[in-house]
């Protein structure tokens, strides 16, 4: 329970930092990993069972490999770092509510909990386009072309004044809309060429760490229900 609470604190701090700057401080994931290794070492020596320290080390290594691949593929650096921290801190967790894949969890050297948290977080992220679509509909957006339907899934049709309130990537206006803009291009954040009353398409740019943090909270109760539906055993 201590490890879980520390992980939750780390994820909350990391999510706030990721929202503000799109980066997280290294002390968060390193702190999670170090504390996890220390706690598992203490538990192993006090109980005479060395499985906790083995699980912590193997969890860190496996999550490090996954995190590094994410970084190389440009999927997310901060998300990979937090995954590494979770791998060492809390590689396993008892699922009291739902688990159809229970036989797999006997392989204690695999960090099932961090991987499941990450998987459920990605699923939550996929729900965002559905939310954006219906939000645009409720705001009176009436799509006529296929491109407009796609835009309703990836962005919001809002005024420039609204876009200035948050950290949003501007997709454009009219025929100049880009469905896949570069988040590293400063021009996508430049709203000076528009009037505050003009409407533009903009993406909320929600970092993956936010749904991962939410997944961290609900996964002990949700378990692997979503995964078991996709991959029935």
From Swiss-Prot:
Localization terms from the record: Cell membrane
Catalytic activity field: Cleaves the signal peptide of 3 to 12 amino acids from the N-terminal of preflagellin, usually at Arg-Gly-|- or Lys-Gly-|-, to release flagellin
Coiled-coil segments: none
Membrane-traversing stretches: 2-18, 24-46, 50-72, 79-89, 111-139, 208-219
GO molecular function, one term: aspartic-type endopeptidase activity
Spans within the Extracellular topological domain: 19-23, 73-78, 140-207
Enzyme Commission code(s) on record: 3.4.23.52
Keyword Transmembrane helix: yes
Thermal behaviour (record text): Optimum temperature is 37 degrees Celsius.
Sites marked Essential for catalysis: 18, 79
Keywords for this protein: Archaeal flagellum biogenesis, Cell membrane, Hydrolase, Membrane, Protease, Transmembrane, Transmembrane helix
GO terms (BP aspect): proteolysis
Protein name: Preflagellin peptidase
